[in-house]
Amino acid sequence: MVEGKVLSVRQAGATTYLNFGRNWTRDFAVTISRRMVAAFEAAGLSPKSLENRRIRVRGFVEARGGPRIEVLRVGQVEVLGGN
């Protein structure tokens, strides 16, 4: 489980990245596939709306180009109160 503030939201190809830091090779990120973006939006939670918000993400941290969790279900991401 990782908790923190989403610094930026970026899309590269079929993947959306929720970046917790400026350096993607060092800082933590959450990855969301294009297919999952549709599921987030259907649940009323656009990935872009998470920018500058505190979130908690559940999953396995992998080291692929930097530490990250790949989101496979909307329920893995929890928006926390405040910033």
PLM features: residue spans?
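OB-fold single-stranded nucleic acid-binding module
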Residues: 1-83
